[in-house]
Amino acid sequence: LFDRVLVIPEPFLAAMGLREEARLSDSGYVDPTRHSLIVDIGAGTTDMCLVQGYYPTPDDQVCYPVAGDAVDKTLADRIRRRWPDLVLSRVTVTQLKERYSCAGSARREAKVRLFADGKPRVIDIADMVRESCEMLVPVIADGIKALLKRCDSDSVVPILQNVILCGGGSAIQGLSEMVQQPLRSEGYEDATCRTPPDYRRLVAVGAVKIAENVRDDQWQIPM
């Protein structure tokens, strides 16, 4: 049991996890805790947060109930409509998505062996996986635009150049590049999205950093 807690938005923790303290004095280093927009794509929600050098307020955040689970459902529906006799569990769908996920110009061959009426059958689900994953693109782009409208004009360009995707959904190959496309086509010419190599552990690393440095009076004591 814990005798104290501190509730912090996951995207802010991700920014802390991405921050490289040893490089803060480098002239060309952009501190992700000062000018960034973090997109955390989880299972149930996609959480986005402006990180501008201070603890984010509710106005700095947006949350959409469209994420990994929604991609799974869409993929399962597409496969079942095309091959209604296939045996397809939720676990199998998730595994197929995680193995073959891609978006945009990133293409993957996805010929898989599934069972129909007790017999093995090889089907090609490449386009279905890609199209299902791409449902996240307009959601993320809309969230980014909504948050940019809340920024000071001086902050828009540096934040737009530092859009960071993390969470399990950011593993979708080609997703960060595809999110840039609708933004740039609508005039956000400086839009730059990226997925850090250690995207899966950023939140955990950030949580440890904060836990080690938080003051005693900042902890929340549960009743």
Model regions: which residues?
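Short glycine/serine/threonine-rich phosphate/pyrophosphate-binding segments
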Residues: 43-49
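Nucleotide/phosphate-binding catalytic cleft detector across ATP-hydrolyzing
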Residues: 1-38, 51-137, 145-163, 170-198, ...
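Periplasmic peptidoglycan-binding/anchoring modules of Gram-negative envelope and division proteins
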Residues: 142
